[in-house]
Amino acid sequence: MKVKLADKHGFCFGVKRAIKLAESHQGGITLGPLIHNKKEIERLKNDFGVTVEESVENLPRGSEVIIRTHGIPKDDLAKLTQSAEKIIDATCPFVTKPQKICEIMSQEGYQIIIFGDINHPEVQGVMSYSSSEPIVVMSPKELFGAKLKEKVALVSQTTKKIEDFLGVASFLVQRCAEVRIFNTICNATFDNQEAARHLSQEVDIMIIAGGKNSSNTKQLLSICLEHCQDSYLIEDESELDPQWFTNKKTCGVTAGASTPEWIIERVVRTIEGYKG
């Protein structure tokens, strides 16, 4: 089986930075999973003794705490400063951008609109920086009936599709007197999506490697399905099904921003061993 790897794929700058920080603080505790990839979280635990704690209240006093790439709510950060021995901030710089924007714009009287998943830890963190209650939506439809103010500021979860973000922006521009639009979608996310979009039009089957709880990985699957019906999301090579590749000649492979290279290499090697 011939395999084509997307030009842009895998670990982004923010994830690489976070992994290095975790590896250099052996025995540290991350507040929530550092990244959305179970296999890499297991590796950090086994090789570096880095464990995960979901709640600030359950952290042992005097701990060395690593803040996840997605950031944490403002209140949790305040609690950490009181209880942790040391705080290692692995929040992706692209995530701190919408946090700061929400803080500043809400203080200036703008109503904050966040395009993203309200249940995602990144969005929950960003929400906490707004001094007034923000509106969080996944589509323009969710804004129908919302009490929009004359002045609004729009930001996006960093891993969303630009087309969907622009749809929300267009809705607001047509209904509000003043709209401040901040494109907070990460450059690496955009590049990975574009590479996946192009590759999925050139192959018979697409494999997307990444955590099934990863927002950016699910976006890659959505994009690939637009152009290649035989697109599959897997966490590692063990989830590959040889029957998927029957009568296929070329397979495209991409990976989410939290997918380590060692998983990608195993996936590619396994697929190369299949007969179409």
From Swiss-Prot:
Q: In which pathway does it act?
A: Isoprenoid biosynthesis; dimethylallyl diphosphate biosynthesis; dimethylallyl diphosphate from (2E)-4-hydroxy-3-methylbutenyl diphosphate: step 1/1; Isoprenoid biosynthesis; isopentenyl diphosphate biosynthesis via DXP pathway; isopentenyl diphosphate from 1-deoxy-D-xylulose 5-phosphate: step 6/6
Pfam families, per database record = LYTB
What EC number(s) has UniProt assigned to this enzyme? 1.17.7.4
Entry keyword 4Fe-4S: yes
Q: Which reaction does it catalyse?
A: isopentenyl diphosphate + 2 oxidized [2Fe-2S]-[ferredoxin] + H2O = (2E)-4-hydroxy-3-methylbut-2-enyl diphosphate + 2 reduced [2Fe-2S]-[ferredoxin] + 2 H(+); dimethylallyl diphosphate + 2 oxidized [2Fe-2S]-[ferredoxin] + H2O = (2E)-4-hydroxy-3-methylbut-2-enyl diphosphate + 2 reduced [2Fe-2S]-[ferredoxin] + 2 H(+)
Q: Name one GO biological process term.
A: terpenoid biosynthetic process
Q: Does the keyword Iron apply?
A: yes
Keywords in alphabetical order:
4Fe-4S, Iron, Iron-sulfur, Isoprene biosynthesis, Metal-binding, Oxidoreductase
Which GO molecular function annotation, any one, does this entry have?
metal ion binding
Please name the catalytic residues of this protein.
E122
The annotation note on the cofactor reads: Binds 1 [4Fe-4S] cluster per subunit.
InterPro entries linked to this entry:
LytB/IspH (IPR003451)
Q: Which residues form a coiled coil?
A: none
Q: Which CDD domains match?
A: lytB_ispH
Q: Which residues bind dimethylallyl diphosphate?
A: H36, H70, H120, S214, S215, N216, S258
Q: Which class of enzymes does this protein belong to?
A: oxidoreductase
- Residues that bind isopentenyl diphosphate: H36, H70, H120, S214, S215, N216, S258
Q: Where does [4Fe-4S] cluster bind?
A: C12, C92, C186
What does the record give as cofactor? [4Fe-4S] cluster
Task: Name the positions where (2E)-4-hydroxy-3-methylbut-2-enyl diphosphate binds.
Answer: H36, H70, H120, T158, S214, S215, N216, S258
Task: Give the family per the record.
Answer: Belongs to the IspH family.
Give a short account of what the protein does: Catalyzes the conversion of 1-hydroxy-2-methyl-2-(E)-butenyl 4-diphosphate (HMBPP) into a mixture of isopentenyl diphosphate (IPP) and dimethylallyl diphosphate (DMAPP). Acts in the terminal step of the DOXP/MEP pathway for isoprenoid precursor biosynthesis.
NCBIfam families (UniProt xref): ispH_lytB (TIGR00216), PRK01045.1-1 (NF002187)
Query: What is the name of the protein in this document?
Result: 4-hydroxy-3-methylbut-2-enyl diphosphate reductase
- What species is given as this protein's source? Wolinella succinogenes (strain ATCC 29543 / DSM 1740 / CCUG 13145 / JCM 31913 / LMG 7466 / NCTC 11488 / FDC 602W)
Q: What is the lineage of its organism?
A: Bacteria, Pseudomonadati, Campylobacterota, Epsilonproteobacteria, Campylobacterales
